[in-house]
From Swiss-Prot:
Belongs to the TRAFAC class translation factor GTPase superfamily. Classic translation factor GTPase family. EF-G/EF-2 subfamily. Residues 8-283 form the tr-type G domain. The keyword Repeat does not apply. Keywords: Cytoplasm, Elongation factor, GTP-binding, Nucleotide-binding, Protein biosynthesis. GO terms for molecular function: GTP binding; GTPase activity; translation elongation factor activity. It holds the Pfam family EFG_C. This is Elongation factor G. GTP binds at residues 17-24, 81-85, 135-138. It comes from Nitratiruptor sp. (strain SB155-2). The lineage of its organism: Bacteria, Pseudomonadati, Campylobacterota, Epsilonproteobacteria, Nautiliales.
């Protein structure tokens, strides 16, 4: 079957933004102008097409990334919706993996917000070229040039406006296109569907000339030929300027800036033109890397229809009508409904049921999905987020996604005994969809513990259990994911010998425990020489140590960042076994850890609080009371921004407290930053409580 859209004309883009920058509204307008949704959904009233889960409608924030397809100027644009709340950075990372380019939306009033910095860093990490859309130009306090400065200073990027606004706040009418040097004003009567091209207004002429010059200079620097021409005093043609903007965008030396007001229907068509003109096709980004599972060698996967099939599953969702949907991005070859593919990550064969393309929340059934495309597969049994699907005869494993460890846990129990099983099923399904969410049973209390990236993250999980799986759950007090580690190196011998009639047990080890740098994790070194412990027992010692690390010696929290070296020991021909050495390893670790100056670690959150100046003193006083350390203070749009490192344990219920002492005018965001030693007086309390 021939492709409907040649791969050069496909754009896979994400629209990334801070919570209130107006991302969903922008996406809605794109869908409106590209002719798919004829009625514009307003987030304020909770009817946006992209936000299709109930809670998103209520909270007005976008949670799951749905992939939507639309068309503009004979190009196909696949939009991956990315959430803007910091508890969902995992979703953002996940969508960054499969995008080729992004539109970063900033609010013309609020500018660069803390979350935008996180998202920007993630886009840098995955080398995602992006263009900037400064939204909400109609709002009081809108300042395009201020946002330009913030992008330069805070995000360390090189923003190059390719438009400047005509008017601002209530007088915002349109933009000056610096490439064509024309004005564009939108017609309010037709909801912005009509616009007219005008000469640049007299009062903006000088500013337009100044910014045109900056644009041409930035473009000239992307290419030797253009630079020679520019330095020789020649004019660059419109074509050359466009070519230069695209080149600079793709190699991320420049970030084109546009502006508008999605809500007032201004600037959306020019944004779509920029997506088509300046963001890359799948063939214009670097080939994705993979591993050949047979040899372990690195291979490159080219974006082309001709070649063995290879795709990445980036999102699993449960759909009430068709069951489990696996959203995939095809990198090479194509996939057909009814065919068989290999899940190389799990080494399982999968049958492809139906293939769907999503248009906001309508679905279209398709027969094939070619390279560079994004769609959903129905009927996969084993595939989870981050798995690779490929041709059985050409296995490849595409890059793995890295998921952060959860930092907060709560105990959940169903309100009725009858719901116990339903709850277990619901949680298992939700954990399949979201790798940053974990479920386990506490061995001592038998309680079900759920862990995630923040309070909001867990609230939404509990909420989804209720809505989608009809399970009402009681939620306990949030618990912090403490860890333990050691500060001093220790040598330890342990001999496990049991003689009680019949076959005995014998394992004898000498280990050295040493602290590692924070975040380095666990390392096991085998320094046994001369066969004092036979090879086959070495992994058992390692396993014993790792099992003992699950419950630390201070308060039973997992132990992190240690290096264990096995350097001596002895064995018995008859009585030694894997079991005996596992016990010896485990006991040696426990004994050593007690002497190695064990300490408790707690997650420290990077907290950003934005408040009017008069509440600044209260905020800082409160942060100090919470054992926090203020890192910096700055001004943003007439408010004060306080950045601080605060232990997660002290942050519970912060939103309520902040609301009360700022009369609801303070906002904050927080994300996990690192683990740090708990002060002794606090640690003693925690240990006493845990050990009862």
């Amino acid at each position: 079957m021939a492709r409907k859209t040649p791969i050069e004309k496909v754009r896979n883009i994400g629209i990334a933004a801070h919570i209130d920058a107006g991302k969903t509204t922008t996406t809605e307008r794109i869908l409106y102008y590209t002719g798919i949704s004829h009625k514009i959904g307003e987030v304020h009233e909770g009817a946006a097409t992209m936000d299709w889960m109930d809670q998103e409608k209520e909270r007005g924030i976008t949670i799951t990334s749905a992939a939507t397809t639309c068309f503009w100027k004979d190009h196909q644009i696949n939009i991956i919706d990315t959430p803007g709340h910091v508890d969902f950075t995992i979703e953002v990372e996940r969508s960054m993996r499969v995008l080729d380019g992004a539109v970063a939306v900033f609010c013309a009033v609020g500018g660069v917000q803390p979350q935008s910095e996180t998202v920007w860093r993630q886009a840098n990490k995955y080398h995602v070229p992006r263009i900037v859309f400064v939204n909400k130009m109609d709002r009081i306090g809108a300042d395009f040039y201020n946002v330009e400065n913030q992008i330069r200073e805070r995000l360390k990027a090189n923003p190059v406006p390719i438009q400047i606004p005509i008017g601002a706040e209530d007088n915002f009418r349109g933009v000056v296109d610096l490439v064509e040097m024309k004005g564009i004003v939108w017609d309010d009567e037709t909801m912005g569907a009509k616009y007219e091209v005008i000469d640049i207004p007299e009062e903006l002429r000088e500013k337009a000339e100044e910014y045109r010059e900056k644009l041409v200079e930035a473009v000239a620097e992307t290419d030797e030929e253009l630079l020679d021409k520019y330095l020789g005093g020649e004019e660059l043609t419109t074509e050359e300027i466009k070519k230069g903007i695209k080149k600079g965008t793709l190699d991320m030396t420049i970030t084109p800036m546009l502006c508008g007001s999605a809500f007032k229907n201004k600037g959306v068509q020019t944004l779509l033109d920029a997506v088509v003109d300046y963001l890359p096709a799948p063939t214009e980004v670097s080939w994705i890397k993979g591993i050949d599972p047979k040899t372990g060698e690195e291979v490159s996967v080219e974006s082309t229809d001709n070649g063995p099939f290879a795709a990445l599953a980036f999102k699993i969702m449960t759909d009430p009508f068709v069951g489990q949907l696996s959203f995939i991005r095809v990198y090479r070859g194509q996939i057909a409904s009814g065919s068989y593919v290999l899940n190389s990550t799990k080494e399982k064969k999968e049958r492809v049921g139906r293939l769907l393309k999503m248009h906001a929340n309508k679905r279209e059934e398709i027969k094939e999905l070619p390279a560079g495309e994004i769609g959903a597969v129905v009927g996969l049994k084993y595939t989870l987020t981050g798995d690779t699907l490929c041709d059985e005869s050409h296995p490849v494993i595409l890059e793995k996604m890295e998921f952060p460890e959860p930092v907060i846990s709560v105990a959940v129990e169903p309100k009725t005994k009858a719901d116990q099983e339903k709850m277990a099923t619901a949680l298992a399904k939700l954990a399949e969809e979201d790798p940053s969410f974990r479920v386990h049973t506490d061995e001592e209390t038998g309680q079900t513990i759920i862990s995630g990236m923040g309070e909001l993250h867990l609230e939404i999980i509990v909420d989804r259990m209720k809505r989608e799986f009809k399970v009402d759950a009681e939620v306990g007090q949030p618990q912090v994911a403490y860890r333990e580690t050691i500060k001093a190196p220790v040598d330890q011998e342990y001999k496990y010998a049991k003689q009680s009639g019949g076959r005995g047990q014998y394992g004898h080890v000498f280990i050295k425990l040493e602290p590692q740098e924070p975040g380095k994790g666990y390392e096991f070194v085998n320094n046994i020489t001369g066969g004092v412990i036979p090879k086959e027992y070495i992994p058992a010692v390692d396993k014993g140590i790792q099992e003992a690390m699950q419950n630390g010696v201070l308060a039973g929290y997992p132990v992190v960042d240690i290096k264990a070296t096995l350097y001596d020991g002895s064995y018995h021909d008859v009585d030694s076994s894997e079991m005996a050495f596992k016990i010896a390893g485990s006991m040696a670790f426990k004994e050593a850890a007690k002497k190695a100056n064990p300490i408790l670690l707690e997650p420290i959150m990077k907290v950003e609080v934005e408040v009017p100046e008069e509440y600044m003193g209260d905020v800082i006083g409160d942060i100090n009371r919470r054992r926090g350390q203020v890192q910096s203070m700055e001004d943003r749009a007439g408010n004060k921004i306080v950045t601080a490192m605060v232990p997660l344990a002290e942050m519970f219920g912060y939103s309520t407290d902040l609301r009360s002492f700022t009369q609801g005018r303070g906002t904050y965001s927080m994300e996990f930053d690192h683990y740090e030693e708990v002060p002794k007086n606090v640690a003693d309390e925690i240990i006493k409580k845990r050990n009862g």
